[in-house]
Structures are given as C-alpha cells and as structure tokens.
Amino acid sequence: MKVSVLITLAVLGVMFVWASAAELEERGSDQRDSPAWLKSMERIFRSEERECRKMFGGCSVDSDCCAHLGCKPTLKYCAWDGTFGK
C-alpha cells in the first residue's frame, strides 16, 4: 500500500513538472511576465542597507550581527551568544 502511494505521488509530481515546463515553453519566460511590483521589491531589497543581521542571518564577523548574537565561525550565521540584558 505504501509503495503504491509513493508511486502515485511520484507520477503526479512528474506530471506537474511536465505541465509546468510545457506551459512555460508556450508562454515564454520573458521578464515582462513578472509583475511590476515584484521588480520594484527586488530593487528595494538590493539597495536597502541593513544595520545588523538577525538570527540565522549570514555574517563574517560578530559586529555584523545584532545585539546578543554572535557570528558562528563554522557556518557563518548569526546565533545567540548566551548573553542577556539590554
């Protein structure tokens, strides 16, 4: 029973990908298809300068992270540094 459910889900997934690819090929993947507000949001996020990185944000040094967060050296992300207070 489990195998038949997995096979059915796999077939449905393949059919979805195939149908999406056919529709994309038919319409084309031109940038004019994307809404104008999406392009403006992309511009805003690219140009916005952030003060500090929040939890799990990428970093290179401790000063990149917000208060009470430190940059983990192995995976380079901001995580709680174990401190409390204001």
From Swiss-Prot:
One of the record's GO molecular function terms: toxin activity
Propeptide residue range(s): 22-50
Signal peptide: 1-21
Reported tissue expression: Expressed by the venom gland.
Keywords: Amidation, Disulfide bond, Ion channel impairing toxin, Knottin, Potassium channel impairing toxin, Secreted, Signal, Toxin, Voltage-gated potassium channel impairing toxin, Voltage-gated sodium channel impairing toxin
Residues annotated with Phenylalanine amide modification: 84
InterPro entries reported for this sequence: Huwentoxin-1
Location of the protein in the cell: Secreted
Chief location bin: secreted
Tagged with keyword tRNA processing: no
Cystine connections: 52-66, 59-71, 65-78
Any one GO cellular component localisation term in the record: extracellular region
Domain notes: The presence of a 'disulfide through disulfide knot' structurally defines this protein as a knottin.
Task performed by this protein: This toxin acts as a voltage-dependent gating-modifier. It inhibits the sodium conductance (IC(50)=124 nM) and slows the fast inactivation (EC(50)=1180 nM) of Nav1.5/SCN5A. It significantly shifts the activation to more depolarized voltages and decreases the deactivation of Nav1.5 currents upon extreme depolarization, but only slightly affects voltage-dependence of steady-state inactivation. In addition, this toxin causes an approximately five-fold decrease in the rate of recovery from inactivation and an approximately 1.9-fold reduction in the closed-state inactivation rate.
Note from the entry: Negative results: does not show effect on Kv1.1/KCNA1, Kv1.2/KCNA2, Kv1.3/KCNA3, Kv1.4/KCNA4, Kv3.1/KCNC1 (all expressed in oocytes), voltage-gated sodium channels (Nav1) (from DRG neurons), and in a range of voltage-gated calcium channels (expressed in rat DRG neurons). In addition, does not show significant toxic symptoms when injected into mice and into cockroaches.
Family indicated by similarity: Belongs to the neurotoxin 10 (Hwtx-1) family. 28 (Jztx-11) subfamily.
Protein name: Kappa-theraphotoxin-Cg1a 3
Organism of provenance: Chilobrachys guangxiensis (Chinese earth tiger tarantula)
Top-level taxonomy: Eukaryota, Metazoa, Ecdysozoa, Arthropoda, Chelicerata
